[in-house]
């Protein structure tokens, strides 16, 4: 996983000022991952759709272009492609999988159905350890997923590698700075894949590694100050890392011009309310208004078991509560002769990509953590994290001096524990789940696993009664489900292989300390087919 330790911290300045690396998305499931890997190499990257006209692509002044994989076959009618002007532009281009085939096909190479499709782990023979394959061993373990192969490279290209099913598995035309590879260097199953990407960026395209947390902060602080001037700003804190880092970054830029609102809906994990009210404020000095609305939320949720209805009630209740606090902020600012003009949101780059948004989006995007903010708020948006992935946000939080407990907090849904109780939400059930969840998080942290696991939802099957024996007595309790998952972006996930001794400790503690729980079970399902959250 990308982490602050992996972000280069030796160079200030920011490569996006000199033009980004553009990742052209042909519908690949790994397109965002390619962009992340470029960032890990210390170079700023952006995703663009393959349908973007080539003149618009080149108008962005890209310093390099990467063509992603995709599900199509290049020789089928209507298959997505790219204008050959890209290859004639002088900009270094790397084609990956389908993007590699597009490059070969459009430049006159021979592409056809593979005699042998290759899926999964595949050994590649390196014919020339140069360019993108500089310093490569004679054989590489790679990750393939193709039923179409480049059988002959276009004129001017040198074959760098082959596999049993791909006569041309990697190629290069150094004179035009064009490169292609059939396997997926962006996935962890290609152990030397990151080295290939770094070779392309630093050796072939001669790009510096100047995308780092310090330069991002410096750049954003300058932009925020220019945007805000002497106006005042409001930010809704959800308790999650995104809104916390966004608020800390804006506060670094404008100080007391920022007021944060934290709505305690009573559905947070153990200690989180205190963490926001005390630790976050102590670390940042931010002015915070806390609204204790726990009883209001519980009253609104009484008797409700259906998951979508829970979400809707929580979202609507949050909006109404935030609006009330917002009026207080506006009145206080008015009394000082000030005007609140801006709203901070912790929008991340995946949110922008998945919503099809671009620069300068005017409408307020529904906040994925809190169920949506009022659509009629007359504020201008400040979204200081909208070019960043989650792990870059963590790096910035660390650089800003936020406590690890906030920066490394596991992702948590806006409806909170409300959608981790299968059944009606009551105060007693919330208290029970809160204790069990705290035990699981504490033991995972003790075992040093809290940064290896993306998140570990703890789910209370409140409407299920499990037979048990506790203290020589027959009991009917509720089962608890542990759902530890590993992921890079939450779009896909695998269940985490938590050591048995850690699981045993968690199970023993929960059943001993939470007497209404007599069974702990492990959810070992990947996403897909299952989602990370149960509701």
UniProtKB/Swiss-Prot annotation:
GO terms for molecular function: ATP binding; GMP synthase activity. Residues 20-210 form the Glutamine amidotransferase type-1 domain. It comes from the Bacteria. The keyword Kinase does not apply. It catalyses: XMP + L-glutamine + ATP + H2O = GMP + L-glutamate + AMP + diphosphate + 2 H(+). ATP binds at residues 238-244. Keywords: ATP-binding, Glutamine amidotransferase, GMP biosynthesis, Ligase, Nucleotide-binding, Purine biosynthesis. Pathway: Purine metabolism; GMP biosynthesis; GMP from XMP (L-Gln route): step 1/1. Its EC number is 6.3.5.2. Residues 211-409 form the GMPS ATP-PPase domain. The active site is at residues 97, 184, 186. One of its GO terms (cellular component) is cytosol. The keyword Disulfide bond does not apply. Catalyzes the synthesis of GMP from XMP. Homodimer. This is GMP synthase [glutamine-hydrolyzing]. It comes from Bifidobacterium longum (strain NCC 2705).
């Amino acid at each position: 996983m990308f982490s602050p330790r992996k972000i280069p911290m030796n160079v200030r300045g920011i490569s996006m000022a000199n033009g980004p690396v553009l990742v052209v998305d042909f519908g690949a499931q790994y397109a965002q991952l390619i962009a992340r890997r470029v960032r890990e190499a210390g170079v700023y990257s952006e995703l663009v759709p393959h349908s973007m006209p080539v003149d618009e692509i080149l108008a962005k002044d890209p310093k390099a272009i990467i063509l992603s994989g995709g599900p199509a076959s290049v020789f089928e009618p209507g298959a997505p492609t790219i204008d050959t002007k890209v290859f004639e532009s002088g900009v270094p281009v790397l084609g990956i999988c389908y993007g590699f085939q597009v490059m070969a096909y459009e430049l006159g190479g021979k592409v056809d159905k593979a005699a042998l499709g290759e899926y999964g782990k595949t050994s590649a023979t390196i014919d020339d350890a140069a360019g993108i394959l500089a310093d490569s061993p004679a054989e590489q373990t790679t990750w393939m997923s193709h039923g179409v192969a480049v059988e002959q490279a276009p004129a001017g290209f040198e074959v760098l590698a082959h596999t049993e099913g791909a006569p041309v598995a990697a190629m290069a035309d150094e004179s035009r700075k064009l490169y292609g590879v059939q396997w997926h260097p962006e996935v962890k199953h290609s152990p030397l894949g990151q080295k290939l990407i770094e070779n392309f960026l630093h050796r072939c395209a001669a790009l510096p590694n100047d995308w780092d947390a310090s330069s991002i902060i410096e750049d954003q602080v300058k932009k925020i100050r220019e945007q805000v001037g002497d106006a005042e700003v409001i930010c809704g804190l959800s308790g999650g890392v995104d809104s916390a880092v966004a608020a800390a970054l804006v506060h670094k830029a404008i100080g007391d011009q920022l007021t944060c609102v934290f709505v305690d809906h009573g559905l947070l994990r153990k200690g989180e309310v205190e963490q926001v009210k005390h630790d976050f404020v102590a670390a940042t000095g931010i002015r915070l208004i806390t609204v204790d609305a726990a009883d209001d939320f519980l009253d609104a949720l009484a008797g409700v078991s259906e998951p979508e209805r829970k979400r809707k009630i929580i979202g609507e209740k949050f909006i109404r509560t935030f609006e009330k606090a917002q009026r207080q902020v506006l009145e206080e600012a008015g009394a000082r002769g000030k005007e609140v003009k801006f709203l901070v949101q912790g929008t991340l780059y995946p949110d922008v990509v998945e919503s099809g948004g671009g620069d300068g989006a005017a409408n307020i995007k529904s906040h994925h953590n809190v169920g949506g903010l009022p659509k009629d708020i007359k504020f201008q948006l400040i979204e200081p994290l909208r070019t960043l992935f989650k792990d870059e946000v963590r790096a910035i939080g660390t650089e800003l001096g936020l406590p690890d407990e906030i920066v490394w907090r596991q992702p948590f849904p806006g409806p909170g524990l409300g959608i981790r109780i299968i059944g009606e939400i009551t105060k007693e059930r919330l208290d029970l789940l809160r204790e069990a969840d705290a035990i699981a998080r504490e033991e995972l942290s003790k075992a040093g696993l809290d940064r290896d696991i993306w998140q570990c939802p703890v789910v209370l099957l409140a409407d299920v009664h499990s037979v048990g024996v506790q203290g020589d007595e027959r009991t009917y309790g509720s089962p608890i489900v542990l759902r530890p998952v590993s992921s890079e972006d939450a779009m896909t996930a695998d269940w985490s292989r938590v050591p048995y001794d850690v699981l045993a400790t968690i199970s023993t503690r929960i059943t001993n300390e939470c007497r209404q729980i007599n069974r702990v079970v492990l959810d070992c399902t990947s996403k897909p087919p299952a989602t990370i959250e149960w509701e």
